From Swiss-Prot:
It is found in: Cell inner membrane. This is Inner membrane protein YdgC. It is a multi-pass membrane protein. Keywords: Cell inner membrane, Cell membrane, Membrane, Transmembrane, Transmembrane helix. One of its GO terms (cellular component) is plasma membrane. Residues 48-58, 109-111 are periplasmic. To P.aeruginosa GlpM. It comes from the Bacteria. The keyword Cell membrane applies. The chain crosses the membrane at residues 27-47, 59-79, 88-108. Residues 1-26, 80-87 are cytoplasmic.
Protein backbone atom coordinates (compact mmCIF):
# COMPACT_ATOMS: atom_id res chain seq x y z
CA UNK A 1 0.00 0.00 0.00
CA UNK A 2 1.48 3.31 -1.03
CA UNK A 3 2.65 5.87 1.47
CA UNK A 4 0.33 8.48 -0.06
CA UNK A 5 -2.71 6.26 0.51
CA UNK A 6 -1.69 5.67 4.13
CA UNK A 7 -1.23 9.40 4.69
CA UNK A 8 -4.60 10.13 3.07
CA UNK A 9 -6.34 7.59 5.32
CA UNK A 10 -4.72 9.15 8.37
CA UNK A 11 -5.77 12.63 7.29
CA UNK A 12 -9.36 11.47 6.73
CA UNK A 13 -9.48 9.96 10.22
CA UNK A 14 -8.22 13.21 11.75
CA UNK A 15 -10.82 15.21 9.81
CA UNK A 16 -13.60 12.85 10.89
CA UNK A 17 -12.56 13.18 14.53
CA UNK A 18 -12.55 16.98 14.20
CA UNK A 19 -16.02 17.03 12.66
CA UNK A 20 -17.49 14.64 15.23
CA UNK A 21 -15.95 16.57 18.13
CA UNK A 22 -18.08 19.57 17.14
CA UNK A 23 -21.40 17.69 17.13
CA UNK A 24 -23.80 17.06 20.00
CA UNK A 25 -22.54 13.46 19.96
CA UNK A 26 -18.93 14.60 20.50
CA UNK A 27 -18.07 11.44 22.48
CA UNK A 28 -18.23 9.40 19.25
CA UNK A 29 -14.95 11.11 18.32
CA UNK A 30 -13.37 8.88 20.98
CA UNK A 31 -14.57 5.78 19.13
CA UNK A 32 -13.02 6.70 15.78
CA UNK A 33 -9.37 6.04 16.80
CA UNK A 34 -10.45 2.52 17.71
CA UNK A 35 -11.59 1.79 14.15
CA UNK A 36 -8.88 -0.54 12.87
CA UNK A 37 -7.68 1.70 10.03
CA UNK A 38 -4.03 1.49 11.00
CA UNK A 39 -4.39 -2.08 12.24
CA UNK A 40 -5.68 -3.09 8.80
CA UNK A 41 -2.68 -1.44 7.18
CA UNK A 42 -0.24 -3.01 9.66
CA UNK A 43 -1.81 -6.46 9.34
CA UNK A 44 -1.77 -6.27 5.55
CA UNK A 45 1.91 -5.29 5.54
CA UNK A 46 2.89 -8.01 8.02
CA UNK A 47 0.94 -10.69 6.11
CA UNK A 48 2.30 -9.68 2.72
CA UNK A 49 5.91 -9.35 3.89
CA UNK A 50 6.18 -12.04 6.60
CA UNK A 51 3.33 -14.50 5.96
CA UNK A 52 0.22 -15.71 7.76
CA UNK A 53 2.02 -17.13 10.81
CA UNK A 54 3.61 -13.76 11.51
CA UNK A 55 0.22 -12.13 11.01
CA UNK A 56 -1.37 -14.50 13.52
CA UNK A 57 1.35 -13.70 16.08
CA UNK A 58 0.84 -9.99 15.41
CA UNK A 59 -2.91 -10.39 15.98
CA UNK A 60 -2.33 -12.03 19.37
CA UNK A 61 0.10 -9.26 20.35
CA UNK A 62 -2.46 -6.69 19.18
CA UNK A 63 -5.05 -8.22 21.49
CA UNK A 64 -2.69 -7.73 24.42
CA UNK A 65 -1.95 -4.17 23.29
CA UNK A 66 -5.42 -3.17 24.44
CA UNK A 67 -3.99 -3.09 27.98
CA UNK A 68 -1.70 -0.05 27.45
CA UNK A 69 -4.55 1.80 25.77
CA UNK A 70 -6.81 1.06 28.73
CA UNK A 71 -4.05 2.28 31.08
CA UNK A 72 -3.87 5.48 29.03
CA UNK A 73 -7.63 6.05 29.29
CA UNK A 74 -7.82 5.34 33.02
CA UNK A 75 -4.83 7.55 33.78
CA UNK A 76 -6.17 10.37 31.59
CA UNK A 77 -9.54 10.19 33.35
CA UNK A 78 -7.77 10.30 36.72
CA UNK A 79 -5.26 13.03 35.82
CA UNK A 80 -7.86 15.36 34.30
CA UNK A 81 -9.53 15.49 37.70
CA UNK A 82 -6.41 16.77 39.42
CA UNK A 83 -4.17 18.63 36.95
CA UNK A 84 -4.30 20.87 33.92
CA UNK A 85 -4.98 19.24 30.57
CA UNK A 86 -1.45 19.41 29.07
CA UNK A 87 0.05 17.81 32.18
CA UNK A 88 -2.72 15.19 32.19
CA UNK A 89 -1.90 14.30 28.58
CA UNK A 90 1.82 14.05 29.33
CA UNK A 91 1.18 11.88 32.38
CA UNK A 92 -1.22 9.63 30.51
CA UNK A 93 1.15 9.17 27.58
CA UNK A 94 3.90 8.32 30.08
CA UNK A 95 1.61 5.72 31.65
CA UNK A 96 0.88 4.31 28.20
CA UNK A 97 4.61 4.20 27.42
CA UNK A 98 5.45 2.38 30.63
CA UNK A 99 2.67 -0.16 30.21
CA UNK A 100 3.58 -0.68 26.53
CA UNK A 101 7.22 -1.22 27.53
CA UNK A 102 6.16 -3.79 30.16
CA UNK A 103 3.98 -5.53 27.56
CA UNK A 104 6.86 -5.72 25.07
CA UNK A 105 9.27 -7.06 27.70
CA UNK A 106 6.75 -9.71 28.79
CA UNK A 107 6.02 -10.65 25.17
CA UNK A 108 9.71 -11.06 24.37
CA UNK A 109 10.29 -13.23 27.45
CA UNK A 110 7.27 -15.44 26.78
CA UNK A 111 7.71 -15.88 23.03
Amino acid sequence: MGLVIKAALGALVVLLIGVLAKTKNYYIAGLIPLFPTFALIAHYIVASERGIEALRATIIFSMWSIIPYFVYLVSLWYFTGMMRLPAAFVGSVACWGISAWVLIICWIKLH
